[in-house]
């Protein structure tokens, strides 16, 4: 084995036609799983035997494909504006922010309980041990149509009730960049924000989200193999007390070229396994014993050096600079971190 403990597996694209599938008003595993010889239930049994928690990604909101007999129609389930035009999700060009094309239709938050009902059936049918809530843990939108009018405050309540029902059903939920309304229900969070929104008015980043969550809900930041700068993102995780999150596929990266998923350009697991195991061990060893503690203070000591202090007095120093730094009698290597445990 690689010596990696406390793993969590997120399995995306397993239902309703894949990553960009049909509405979750009905749930059906993709047929390729059967051809591969491993059912959803068998996968989870295998992971459980290895002590790995599995979270199956579900989409309670986006509808990428609208097919005959899939139970969804925009007329019945889609949210709309006061003038009855559909509310949908568009993709935009990065260069100038102009609209590219429709990315997906939506399911009105009015039907959150109906979607949760379909997911609960799937939980029972396929013995799902955990769900990743995806966009529903952060994305709130209204529905202005008279027949199922739902403002954002009502939507928040409806999603909260759905999460509560799903938590009761599976026992384990994961959030994705989750807002406050999802926190009472989730056991783990991915894509937790590690830095500011980058507005020019801001001088420094403070890991506020991490400071609120640490010691209550374990979390990780973005998938670090997808980051522009792996090393900086890795150090951000250390500064913020976050777990390491990787997004992988079994096949070669070239499989995704010229598809809707070509943004996933660095995801073949074989290229990352050794690096991930090595970095995990380094962080796990250094931060052992701090997982359940609160972060009580965060300081920017100099331009490239931060200090995160935990409730037992332990301090984690991160140096983003290209030269070694000295702080509190501790030398922090270039582009590295150092830990002073509270008992030292």
Residue ranges and their predicted role:
Residues 1-67, 154-161:
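Aromatic- and glycine-enriched glycan-recognition loops and surfaces
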Residues 6-8, 53-55, 129-132, 172-174:
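Structural preference for beta-strand elements that scaffold enzyme active sites
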Residues 11-15, 135-137, 321:
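A mature extracytoplasmic/lumenal domain signature
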Residues 60-128, 137-344:
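Active-site-proximal substrate-binding groove within the catalytic cores of carbohydrate-active enzymes
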